[in-house]
């Protein structure tokens, strides 16, 4: 079982000719809503990868909650661990200009109310894979890492978005997944040694005994374990929208580990899923199905 403890949002997206200046009103051409939040996105990706998934998080008692959870429900994700709170459902207000530039305001809402006490709803047990991100209170992420270890579960921590104080508990996770920017920032916070990123990844893995995975967008993915270094190339694609690629990677990676794939195979499968997610607009709607990912993997080999 994969247990995702994380954020659930509804994204409110306005397409505008150009981004407004303070005090200015600009015209828009389209408005859409879409379920989001790193936790929910990753839970759906793990489910589409073929895993059984339980989501632990919170939404509001408002009209946004049902839509925020709609695709998770369709994907047969167990939502028994999702609380209803008096806070609003988490929202991201997004304006996208014709040139692709955007501005985003994220209001955590109910996500900020996910406290360590809620972790009892995860029902952690030996062999589970616990998937975490930094969009809920960091004290809850820290507590989840401790409780998962005590239960004998495997932990995957996606260090997004970057939060400096998260550097203090990175080494509690069995697998740390970061993008280039995040890893470089954590590397500074942790004073990692090495002339380049790969060397600093080796330094982290060697010091902590953990496995660190760094996604490189179009350049693929690198991973360092205490004893080896892996690099997996990316498929060549022309991206339409990269918004859900990182979350898709994380969900597929956790599902692949849970199903017993070796690290290199898990990285290749997650990388293929992440690249396919770039071929459609949106985060959750773009997450590919397992059959499409496995077909893409066969085509590359």
Map each language-model feature to its residues.
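Conserved phosphate-binding/catalytic loop of the ribokinase/pfkB sugar-kinase fold
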Residues: 58, 82-84, 94-129, 134
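Short gly/ser/thr-rich secondary-structure transition/capping motifs
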Residues: 76, 109-115, 155-161
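Conserved beta-alpha-beta core of the PfkB/ribokinase-like small-molecule kinase fold
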Residues: 129-199, 219-221
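Glycine-rich phosphate/adenosyl-contacting loop at the front of the ribokinase-like
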Residues: 1-58, 63-70, 74, 238-240
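Conserved phosphate-binding/catalytic region of the ribokinase-like
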Residues: 164-167, 189, 194-301
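A glycine-rich helix N-cap at a beta->alpha junction
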Residues: 71-86
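A short, aliphatic-rich alpha-helical micro-motif
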Residues: 124-125, 170-171, 206
